[in-house]
Amino acid sequence: MSMAALHEVVLDQVATPPALQSGGMVRLLTCGSVDDGKSTLIGRLLWDSAAVTEDQRDAILQASHSRAVNGEQIDFSLLLDGLQAEREQGITIDIAWRYFETPKRRFIIIDAPGHEQYTRNMATGASHADIAILLIDARHGVKRQTRRHAAICDLMGIKKVVLAVNKMDLIGWSEPAYRAIETEFARLAQGFGFTEITAIPVAALTGDNVARRSACMAWYDGPTLFDYLEAVEPRVEPADAPFRLPVQLVLRADGDFRGYAGTVASGTIRPGDRIVDARSGLGAVVRRIATMDGARAFATKGDAVALQLDTELDISRGAVLSEVSRRPINADVLEARLVWLAETPFDPELGYLLRTATDLTPVTSMSVQALVDFETLASTPAHACAVNDIADCRILLGRATSLDLFRDLPATGNFILVSAIDGATVAGGVITWAQSGAPAVGENVLVLDRALLARGLCADLGDSPADTAEFHRRAQEAAILLRSAGVPVLVEI
C-alpha cells in the first residue's frame, strides 16, 4: 500500500465521526499538550494489538524509514495523522476517528489535537467520549494545556480518566518523577467531577506498559494501558433514567398515520406508557412504536423511532416528550458553563441562538460572569471571553425551552450557541441552573449583592485575587442552596 493509499484510509476516518450507537462500544479520547505523544501512543496500541493490516504495516515502515524522524524507529503517529498538514508539521490538527477491536471489546478512538489553537477541535471530540486518556510528558509534568484539557473533559461530563505519563524512557524510568506528576494531577483533579483516575507510566515509542508490561519499570504494579481498556466498565445509563424524546419532526402518511419522530435521548418507552409534552403540558398514551424495521415492543436510548399516540398533540420540532412524573424544566433563564469556540470573542451586542437537542431558541440577553483560570483552576470574575476560554454565563431566552440540568441528565442538559448572523457555532456548554421566567427584583426575590455578602458570609475575605475568587465561589454556592430550597435568587456581585 502506498502512502497515498494509506492517506485515503486515514482521511476517511478523520472528516466525520462515525455512528456512535453501540451498547458494548467504548468511546475513547486522547488529549494533552502538544508533543506529549498522543498519536504515537494510540498508533503503538493499534500496532501491538494486531489492529493494523499487513499493507498498512508495510506502508508505515516504508514511510518511517524514508522520513527518518525517529532514526530507525517506527513513526506510529502516521496511523492517526491523516491530514497532509499534520504529516508535514508532525502535529494533530483535526480529530482522527479510528475503530479498534480486541477479543473482549470494541472501541472508537478519538485522537484530539494538543495545540492551544485547536482546542475547539478537542472540545468537539470530548463531547463524544466516555473515557479520556490524558497524556503528560514525563519531562515537563502538568502544563497549562493539560489543565485546560482536564477542565474540558470535566465540562463535557467525562468521569473516567487515564493519566498516561509518557516518555518515561527519557527520564530514566524514574519512579519519583512519575509519583510527583501523579500527585500533582490528583491535587488539581479534586476540583473536577472525575469518579475514577488511573495513572499509568508508559513509553509509547518503545511500547512499555502500552500493550506489554515494562521490564524497565518493575516498581509499577498496575495494569498496562491495554489491560485497563479491556477491563474498564463503559459508561452505562441508569436503568431508571427518565424518558426523553426530543421531537425532530412530525410524520404524516397513509391518511391516518401521525408519528412523533426523534431519537430517544434517555430512558425507555413502551406501548401503553403515558407521556407528556413538557412545554404545553399536553399528554397522551403511546399506542405504537414505529421504526424502519416495523413496530417495536420498547425503545431505549439511541433508538430512532416514531411514536404513535392515542391522541394527536399539537406540537412540532423542538418539543420534548417525557414521562409524566419526571418532566424536564421549561426554562427561559439559564446559568451555564461553556467553552468559547469561535475566533471572534463574545459580544453582548451580537445575536445568538441556543441550540438544544432539536430546538433553536433566540437569546435575548447573555452575560459572562466568570472565567476558569487555567493556572489555579479557580473561577475568576469576568465580563468577556475569547476563543478557548471556559466561562460561566447567564443566558436569557426569548421563549421557554424544555431541558434538564447537565448533572441530572447530560443528554438534554447540553447545548451549542450559534451566531444568529451566519449560523456558525461559537460555543458549546452545559446547563448548571435553569428556571422559568426571569425574576424581577422585588419583595419575593432575594438579591445576593456584594454588600449583603460582605456583611456576613464573606466578611473574612479581602481584595486579593484569591479572596475575590473565593467570594465569587461562596456567592454561587449560597445561590445554589437557596434555589434548591425554592427561594428565587439573583446574584449581583
Mark where each language-model region is.
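C-terminal effector/interaction modules appended to NTPase cores
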Residues: 2-40, 102-103, 253-444
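P-loop NTPase switch module centered on the Walker A-proximal segment
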Residues: 7-117, 129
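Conserved nucleotide-binding/hydrolysis micro-motifs of P-loop NTPases
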Residues: 36, 47-51, 115-116, 139-143, ...
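Active-site phosphate-binding and catalytic loops of NTP-dependent enzymes
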Residues: 66-70, 81-93, 188-197, 230-243, ...
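Conserved Switch II/interswitch segment of TRAFAC-class P-loop GTPases
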Residues: 105-107, 112-118, 126-179, 489-493
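Canonical P-loop GTPase G-domain recognition
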Residues: 171-240
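Accessory interdomain/linker segments of ATP-dependent helicases and helicase-like nucleic-acid enzymes
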Residues: 205, 222-261, 276, 283
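Glycine-rich phosphate-binding loop of ATP-dependent small-molecule kinases
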Residues: 431-493
